[in-house]
Amino acid sequence: MNFERLTTYLDELQERYGVPGSDLLVTKNQEEIYRHLTGYRDYEHKEATKEDQLYRLFSATKVITMIAVMQQIEAGKIGLYDELQKFLPEYGTLYVVDESKDYGWGNWPDASAPCHLSHKPIRIIDLMTMTAGLNYNTEPPTGMSLSEDKASAGKKEAQMKGAPGETLTQKVMRAAAQMPLLFEPGTHWAYSLAHDVLAAVVEVVTGQRFSDYLEEHIFLPSGASDLTFHPNAEQEKRMAALYVSKNGTKEMLPCTDLSVLGLRMLSQFESGGGGLIGGVEGYSKVIAALANGGVTGKGERLLTEKSIRLFMTPYTSGELQLDFMKMQKFGYSYGLGVRVLTEKGSSRSPLGEFGWDGAAGAYVLIDPIHHLTIFYAQHTLAYDAVFTEVHPRIRDLVYEALED
């Protein structure tokens, strides 16, 4: 193995792409085979990147949520083809917008949009494959009032009506049923709040708060620490400074407007789609189990090998694949909550490798064929080149290094 070219590339990220700091960890057969840190945790104060640094994982959270859902499918508490209303009755009556418009960030349909009754129910598999018709409106839903949460600086506290003992995660996702669907379930693909809804479903079937479930059934068995929705004061101090690209360029500015977090600003909301905060080492311990037959480095089983094979299976084709291609995951299709490599010519990694990424630049690759994982973290928002250029290049350089 020769990682020299990869190391050189990572060291050039600040100059070429404006990345203030980064951390990359590669494992094979549960063992770390490469790790390299670059730059600064806080660029303005020249505080160097450290191994115990924490990041907002954003949508890299989705991979963890899929493990939880698949565990409950294995336990027989959730069925792939169960209707969502079985767990959240609010989704029993659904409305679909009459016209397919260019809905998107900041322009989602609301309850006033012309709609008609849906002809199809939402099923669990529709949520897992992002074909449910939901949108990605992360603004607090109708009926929620916000106030400052004195116990968590910068976060908000929410008040909503709901059943006694019901978590805010469930309340928010039940309220989200008011939003009209973008299309009939199963007919198109759209990036959405599906994983957040699935987190609420896990809470319903287990009777546990989502964070408690993840800690007991995923993080502890993996030996993973510092993965949380609710960082304590000590963990907050280890958070990397968050930056945002200026107009899509490599010029990075400190991100002072945390309203970009949307629902994740709610102190008690546990977003299965993007709410986790964590470090590179802890996250890598979890995904290493997926690359090694579902068994953690501690010898505890998270998932069966059958479930791992399901993650390696693509589900988008035809119209659905055309929709997914707008995400610019070249060579990939979408599977059960993750991207799946389906075109060998576009990557040095093997067919069936899967994973996802996060808005601040996190990158997840799980390769069960070679028992390999890649987890890369940085902390910059709104810079597309990270996803279309940096992530694929890191992937290919890792595999080149393994071949040398």
Question: Where do the language-model regions lie?
Answer:
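Hydrophobic (often cysteine-bearing) scaffold residues that line and stabilize catalytic clefts
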Residues: 2, 6, 57, 61, ...
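Short, conserved catalytic-motif segment at the N-terminal edge
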Residues: 2-57, 77-79, 93-106, 341, ...
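Active-site SXXK
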Residues: 7-10, 30, 56-84, 93, ...
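Extracellular/periplasmic catalytic domains that process cell-envelope and extracellular macromolecules
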Residues: 18, 117-121, 366-368
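A generic structural motif
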Residues: 39-41, 257, 380
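Short, surface-exposed loop or secondary-structure junction motifs
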Residues: 92-351
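Short glycine-rich, acidic/polar surface loops and turns
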Residues: 337, 358-366
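Short, well-ordered beta-strand elements
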Residues: 364-365, 371-380
